[in-house]
Amino acid sequence: MRNLPTVTRYLLIANFIIFFLSGILERNFGIDVNAIGGLHYYNAHSFHWWQPFTYMFLHANLSHILFNMLAVWMFGATLDNAWGSRRYLIYYIVCGLGAAFIQECVWSVMLSNMADTYDAFSIAHYAYNLTTIGASGAVFGVLFAFGWLFPDTPMFILFIPIPIRARTIVIIYAIVELFAGMGNMMGTHIDNVAHFAHLGGMLFGWLLLLYWRRNNWREPGSSEWWWKVKQKCRELFNRHQRLDSTKEKDYDNYHYHKRL
């Protein structure tokens, strides 16, 4: 654990502590932390402003948190080392918030489609009980970034004995999540998983990576010559400014001592 980069280490610690504390609070005091901190529909009485942030630190069961934290450990640690703690934390949180936003949009569409079939009371009751928890949205964003930055890295999927490139795995996951989400929307395959939130994490991760690229941020391993030229010019310019500043100070000191 000590060898892990800073943000990855604290994300793992925070998620596991919150998971076990929420279980203790529910069993011993009857406090449902998932109902308080989980993401609810924005127009329901159960919604609170902190939920788009807190929901990504809550998990339904042990397998839920283990799979998410395994991905944080495998892929997040690499991004944490490559980007640095500050940039990686920003990316993780943005992906989680983006996943929450997409999930809210999906709920809005679902509830509007129910208007022709159900009465207002039934819709309000259904909206009140809509809840999403888990770091999966942020994790899918992390997976997307790994495939974006290290596309040719060989990876293995369970029950498939051959290595698959990271970019291919990201595409496969995105397609599976899209079809599963559409199945939930149409009622052909309901599995109580926020598939569109996963896609939302990927989408907002992609948008953030594009924003960083357009603002002259370079991915690890890039050999873009123009970036290197600009960096070299910036270094020479800063060095020239430091030399000019030193000369001015020496000149002022010389005339000061001369007057004395």
Residue ranges with predicted function:
Residues 31-57, 116, 124:
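Extracytosolic (periplasmic/ER-lumenal) interhelical loops and adjacent juxtamembrane/interface segments
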Residues 16-33:
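Alpha-helical transmembrane segments of multi-pass membrane proteins
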Residues 52-149, 184-200:
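Transmembrane helix-loop-helix
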Residues 9, 50, 86-89, 167:
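Residues that define the loop-to-transmembrane-helix transition and helix capping
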Residues 1-7, 13-19, 177-260:
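C-terminal transmembrane module of polytopic alpha-helical membrane proteins
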